Regions:
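Structured mid-to-C-terminal alpha-helical surface segments
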Residues: 1-167
């Protein structure tokens, strides 16, 4: 049977939680041992690269108020209590844990990817260029570079500033 790897399964869950900030995803992450992030970082990077959002929006997301989603779409799904304060604490801890585990090499790779010229030798997960979601993201970056280079460069600069990496 073909199954998804542990790294992709849990790395994907973390990527989804940071991108969507939905209570279901963060509930799952609350009970994951995120101190072992290094065990799932490869899968996280793959899902981060294939996301439909800029990398910065996952590494440094604007907090979304999910009170209504918690009440209407999650409440009653678990016997384990999960209040909005748990949700906010989990989101904060997850963001901190992910960013604390990004090495300088990881950061340099993410900048090169967001520039549209990934240095795969710096990618902890190796060359992911053949994955359809990664190809799609790189095509979109290329389109942005051609159609609105200023917006593209501003996005790269924002990521560089957050990661504290200079040209």
């Amino acid at each position: 049977a073909r199954t998804v790897s542990y790294s992709q399964l849990y790395g994907g869950k973390i990527a989804a939680a940071l991108s969507r900030q939905h209570p279901r995803d963060l509930f799952d992450c609350k009970y994951m041992d995120t101190t072992l992030f290094c065990d799932v970082k490869d899968g996280f990077i793959l899902c981060l690269l294939g996301s439909d959002k800029p990398i910065i929006e996952s590494l440094h997301p604007n907090a979304i108020d999910q009170t209504e989603a918690l009440e209407n779409q999650f409440e009653g799904m678990s016997d384990i209590p999960f209040h909005y304060s748990d949700y906010e604490e989990t989101r904060k801890n997850l963001i901190e844990q992910v960013n604390a585990n990004m090495t300088n090499t990881d950061k340099e790779f993410l900048i090169s990817f967001e520039n549209g010229e990934p240095d795969w030798s710096k990618c902890c997960a190796g060359d992911l260029s053949n994955y359809p979601s990664v190809k799609w993201k790189l095509q979109n970056i290329d389109k942005l570079v051609k159609s609105n280079p200023k917006k593209h460069q501003e996005g790269v600069q924002k990521l560089q500033n957050f990661l504290k990496i200079q040209d």
